[in-house]
Design a protein with these regions (language model features):
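HotDog/MaoC-like acyl-thioester-processing domains
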Residues: 7, 11, 68-69, 80-170
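Compositionally biased, charged N-terminal/linker segments
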Residues: 12, 27-42
Length: 170
């Protein structure tokens, strides 16, 4: 099976926070952050697999510190764990106060993509960690994959009991 270094999938994007990006608390709107996370993660997944990829799940997003208008936001994404056709992408969000020069981890996210060929799941290369950060993410990946598998089963079970009736006609 083909293997690739995690760094080969790395995608980085830096943006500036503008007034129209802010919520009523004068911090970056969470939906804007999630859209950027999904976008940068999709690049890492496609770069790793060299195939069309679809977002299977946003597994966890932890908003650690607020992001303000004086900040720039750097998104770093790379594939940190793989299954047969799935890829777990880690996204690290770093905010930098452009006036003070202070940097901080503002958010982290694990997001799963599935590689497709002719509309069907297709195999992906395994990943090779090099740095301490990559080794930790890779080593803990199987635990997160198992948790996702259990959660997906529960979601399917829940979908069976959810109603499709129109709430306005009850």
């Amino acid at each position: 099976m083909e293997k690739k270094f995690m760094r080969e999938s790395k995608a980085i994007k830096t943006t500036r926070v503008f007034p129209n990006d802010l919520n009523n608390h004068q911090t970056l709107f969470g939906g804007k952050l999630l859209a950027e996370i999904d976008s940068i993660a999709s690049i890492a997944a496609a770069r790793h697999s060299r195939k069309h990829c679809v977002t299977a799940s946003i597994d966890s997003v932890d908003f650690l510190t607020p992001i303000h208008q004086a900040d720039s936001v750097c998104y770093e994404a790379f594939v940190c764990y793989t299954g047969k056709s799935s890829m777990e992408v880690f996204v690290k969000v770093i905010a930098e106060n452009l006036l003070a020069g202070e940097r901080r981890i503002a958010a982290t996210c694990f997001i799963t993509f599935v590689a497709l060929k002719d509309g069907k799941p297709s195999s992906v290369p395994q990943v090779l960690p090099e740095t301490e950060e990559e080794h930790w993410l890779h080593t803990t990946g199987s635990e997160r994959a198992e948790s996702r598998k259990k959660g997906r089963g529960k979601s399917k079970e829940m979908a069976e009991v959810l109603t499709l009736s129109k709430p306005w006609s009850m």
